[in-house]
Amino acid sequence: MAETYDFLFKFLVIGSAGTGKSCLLHQFIENKFKQDSNHTIGVEFGSRVVNVGGKTVKLQIWDTAGQERFRSVTRSYYRGAAGALLVYDITSRETYNSLAAWLTDARTLASPNIVVILCGNKKDLDPEREVTFLEASRFAQENELMFLETSALTGENVEEAFLKCARTILNKIDSGELDPERMGSGIQYGDISLRQLRQPRSAQAVAPQPCGC
């Protein structure tokens, strides 16, 4: 049976290699931790239908390789993305220091209006932390990002990260800030929304005419 949904959003998962991007995606799609995860080569893909704010939304999620040698390949997948998880490892300052470059890529190659949530992953390794919550919060605030610390291992805040991003996109559609019909918006109407959009015209076409007698 074909899936029905109100909207389809294209999402990216971006950040340096070894931050747990593939594990976050796997936890969100399969609701379990991905054992023996290797570095992504190129891109990986997953999708899931979720309910957000009374709407049914299909998330198409592209997990991009973090290694520099794959950047030219993965950048082509940025186009037309509506949302992104920008991931660093709380136990690796090096991955945190590279966030600005990843964010620049997202806003340049996808869209200046892309909705981004910063994810400090591997929260379960808090004793090995190199990046404080306060420091990352400040970076998020300065760059107008949402922010959560996540654990792909335990699942903590993984679902919330994706849903929070989707909820923000829906709010921007409702406010008129984002237009699903604009080319490259990363948003498509699903069957449900298309039927609702067409309904007024159909109803208008068959509306009874007033009697002239």
Swiss-Prot record:
GTP binds at residues 18-23, 37, 39-40, 66, 121-122, 124, 152-153. Its EC number is 3.6.5.2. Belongs to the small GTPase superfamily. Rab family. The modification 5-glutamyl serotonin is found at residue 67. Its cofactor is Mg(2+). The modification Cysteine methyl ester is found at residue 213. SMART domains: RAB (SM00175), RAN (SM00176), RAS (SM00173), RHO (SM00174). This is Ras-related protein Rab-4B. A motif (Switch 2) lies at residues 65-74. Pfam families: Ras. It is found in: Cell membrane; Early endosome membrane. Transmembrane segments: none annotated. GO terms for cellular component: cytosol; early endosome membrane; insulin-responsive compartment; perinuclear region of cytoplasm; plasma membrane; recycling endosome; synaptic vesicle membrane. GDP binds at residues 18-23, 121-122, 124, 152-153. It comes from Rattus norvegicus (Rat). The gene is Rab4b. It catalyses: GTP + H2O = GDP + phosphate + H(+).
